[in-house]
Amino acid sequence: MRTLSIVVFLVAACVALPAAADQINLPARKPGQWKIEMLRGTAPAMTIQLCLDTASDKAMMESGLSITSDKCSSVSMTQNGDTITVDAACKFGPMATKSHTVITGDFQSAYTIKTISDLTGGGPLMPKHSETTQNVTWVGECNGLKPGEMMMPGGMKINTLNAMKPMGG
């Protein structure tokens, strides 16, 4: 159960941070399958596959915006060319996080999300400080996934919109 909670938290991070940037006219992502390679500290890389169409991308963005507005006491966003910077202070139940995120890329073929965050109240298994890089690349048409579905390592399929509901999205 603890692993599922961490996965849901990571799913929220994948969706909510780009969604928060939507407030400064972030372009829609290209429909199809996206590969998300998550790198965090010395942990092995985690690769996730995400299938999007126009409707699921919009719904995920709206869900992420809902989480941001409901769970974050402060969000500051700036854009300079193709670089978007987001600073946020958010609370998810007993967990509070402060994060600094830099997003670069075109959202049609690739983008990168680099986040530095500090977490309190997450229990002994949650990292207190983390630096995460998500390298996101478009790989083509969806292969075995429906729009809005995410394939986690080990073959676990998650409907991203359903996963966001417990977090307020």
Residue ranges and their predicted role:
Residues 1-6:
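Positively charged n-region of N-terminal signal peptides that target proteins for export
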